[in-house]
Every structure is written in structure tokens, then in C-alpha cells.
Amino acid sequence: MIDIPDALIATQSKYNGETGRAFLAALPGRAAEFLERWGLRPDGAALHGMCALVLPVVREADGRPAALKLQPVDEETAGEPVALRVWGEAGAGAVELLDHDPATGTMLLERLDSGRPLAGVADEREAVRVLAELLARLSSVPAPAGCGLRRLGDVVARMLEEAPGAVEALSDEAERRLLADCAAAVREVAGEPGDRVLHWDLHYGNVLAGGAADCGAALQDRERGPDREPGRGGWGAVDHRTADDRWVAIDPKPLVGDPGFELLPALVNRFDAAAVRWRFDLMTEALGLDRERERARAWTLGRLLQNGLWAVSDGERRLEPEQVEIARLLLGRG
């Protein structure tokens, strides 16, 4: 029998309503089912994020530490095992998928060290460099034909349909112009949405050091609050890395598209207005986008539009100040 954390109960009930409550009700039985089906034994206290429950386990057949991840299947999570398999075949640096049940979305993942996230690296430039290099590996992988992942072209089409109403809903005239300019920028590149497998939310908290010292490879949503924007927090005081560390990407919300759509989390997470330009330049260079910076800029403005649309849909009439500052800088108004 597992104990479901109160915080997971609260978030599932608040944000997913009846669907969330049904997921919670099924969790104890589902956990027991997969512990038995996949030959696993519990190996520590359960962890959770906004939507997932993660159980540290050991695979009895070979003694391998692993992480059993149970989460609802929705538009964002449905593609996670697909992307992990594609990246795994390419050796791109994502957490290894050991097993998966398509009917429930349950996954068995390699166990990483949640006590050593990239966010704990004190040297900001080194952390951005590691993130950029990992992102370059992930976004270099073409999406296989018929993979079923959601596509950036479809996402952007919906965004552009919603943009005029969202612009009108904002109470600040300058922010209305800013959001309209974000929409105009992404409209220019929407006709070529790209064909790479994107992580969508790769930032410092979604990169962990390899190793099974702790369960956490599958700990979801450490990066995003209810507003669905990348998380915040200060740089760690201690650099936890060793020379042998293998940095691994976790928690993708994958889609197929242009790598330029991947840059915003690295700009807004651990926000520093003075760092936006050099982070953007470093990221575009690492991803091979330095000759197409205008295109990367447009896609990043598209991500800002996406966040703005979500804010308005949540009832907000002002944009997040950090989002406004990044948009101003990318539009040359900072």
C-alpha cells in the first residue's frame, strides 16, 4: 500500500478536477499492479511533482535501481515515452526508458540523482553551457515518420488564432503591443515549423546527474508551477559536479518542431535581465542557430506568446514582468 502525498492530492484535485481525482483513486492499485508485473520492490519513500507519483524501486531480476513513474495521460505527457525511446536510440542524453505501459502511461525509468541537479552548479556560465550542449544533442534528432508526437505547426496555428483575443484582454497598452509583436514575429516563421524532437522545457532543474544515489529521474514538474511557466529560484551555492558526471535530461513535454522554440526556459529560469542576451547567444551558437538568430528570436517570442496566452486564459490581465523584460530585450527595446 502506498501513501499518496497530500500535496499531490491537492494539485490533482485543483487543476485536473474529476480526472485528477479518478487518477488518485486508481493510484494504489496501479502501483501494486506494476510492482508485481515488472518484478519491482520498493526502495524508499515516494516522491511527487505537480502531476506524477514516483516510487524508487529495485528491479528484482537484476538488482537494478529504477524509478516507477505514474502519471495521468494528457496532451503533454502522452509523448514522453515516444521521445525517450527516440532519444535513447540516438544516445542523445535523455533519461533511459526501461519499460512502458501505453494504456496507463506508467513508465519505468533509470534512477538518477535528484540531489544533484544542474541548478546546483554555482558557475552560471558553466550551467548554461552544459544545458546548451545537452539541448543541442536532443534537438538534433529528427522525428521519425508517424511517431505521433504533437507538432509545433499545429500548436502555433492555435496560438495565432487565440492571440487577438488575448491581446485585447490585457489591461496595459504597452503589454498589448508587446504581445501583438510576439504574435507577428512567430507568424513570420510559422510556415516552417521544423522536424526535430523537442524537449519543450529543458532548464537547470530538469537536468540531473547520472547515478542511482537517489530517486528522482522521473520527478515531474519541479520546473513549473500552476501557471505552466518554467520555474524560478537562485543559483545553488555549491557545484555538485564531479569529472565523471553524466548530465541527463528528464521530464520532457515533447513535440516536433524547430529547435529555436526550445530557448526560453534557459532565459526565464534563474532570471537575470543582464544575462538574457549572452545566454541567448550562447544557446544559439551551441545549437548551430547562430546564422539564424532572427529565426531563433522569432520562435522564442513565440514561446513568450504561448505563456501570455496561458496567463490570459488563467484570468490574468497583466503579463509576468520577467516575460515582458525578455520580450523587450529580444525586440530591441531593452
Each language-model region and where it sits:
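A glycine-centered beta->alpha junction motif in the catalytic cores
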Residues: E60, V73, G105-E124, S140-P144, ...
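A conserved alpha-helical element in kinase catalytic cores
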Residues: L24, P28, R64-L138, A274
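Helix-rich C-terminal or lid/interface subdomains of diverse kinases
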Residues: L8, Q12-L24, P28-G29, D258-F261, ...
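Conserved beta-strand elements flanking the ATP-binding pocket of the protein kinase catalytic core
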Residues: L55, V95-D101, G194, R297
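Active-site Asp-x-Gly
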Residues: A209-A217, D221, R232-R293
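Hydrophobic residue at the +6 position relative to the catalytic HRD Asp in the kinase catalytic loop
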Residues: G205-V207
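An alpha-helical support segment within catalytic cores of ATP-dependent transferases
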Residues: F23-L35, S140-W200, G210-G211, D244-D245
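Conserved NTP-binding catalytic cores of kinases and kinase-like/nucleotidyltransferase enzymes
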Residues: M1-A94, G210-E223, R228-W247, L330-G334
